[in-house]
Amino acid sequence: MSSARFTYPFRYVPSPEIRHAAHSLIERIGSDESLRPLFAEGKMMGVLQTDAGFLYAFSGLAGGRAVIDGFVPPIYDYTDPEGYFRKTEARISAMTDGEQKSRMSAELQDWLFHRYRVSNARGESLDIAEIFSRRGLVPPAGTGDCAAPRLLQYAYSKGMKPLAMGEFWYGESRGGKVREHGRFYPACTGKCGPLLNFMLEGLEVEPNPMDREYHRREPETIYIDADIIVVNKPAGMLSVPGKLDVVSLLDYLRDRYGR
């Protein structure tokens, strides 16, 4: 059985059930002549255990396809050649480089992010642009196309309860990145940090092990008076809040001294 708490996706050890499901998927792809060529390029994949069974997803496109039987669909499918995105993208690509092309490209990307609408376990829904803007951020290109958000969004849309999750690499390494076939990796922080933090709201999630690490190694207050505080910060601890829900030195000081 999986633990009662859902997987903390940015730093985790996959459960035995997730490992077994991933191994079964790897074997299925390897033995299926129709699937094997689609993933030959190498692909990050994901497995989600729910109260209704297991779900599977791949990141981005596989063999140029966004929808493949046996895998959850993308949050938003922009690949229709007759759709607004592809037609506008083609017009922009044909333009001469310059300010207008850059502006139209940015507008199209923003249009796309407003099409990606995701939910959390509380039943709340926001689009990707809104989620990032609440943190004063602009979503990077490709946000929403990773396996983890696809899995969670599909589960929520079907009324399934997520229990455990893992993302692993299938195939050969590519693009200069060292990836090991079958090895599990944490969710990316740039694209998936703000997104998954929203989508996991309402679920009881495993604690961030880095938080536990910091609680064991509290900052040492060296000097304090009415105006200043001098603190020895543990190695690796963030000075100010970042993209992930990790305790920073500023969080610690505000909690302890109330200012």
Predicted regions span which residues?
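RNA pseudouridine synthases
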Residues: 1-259
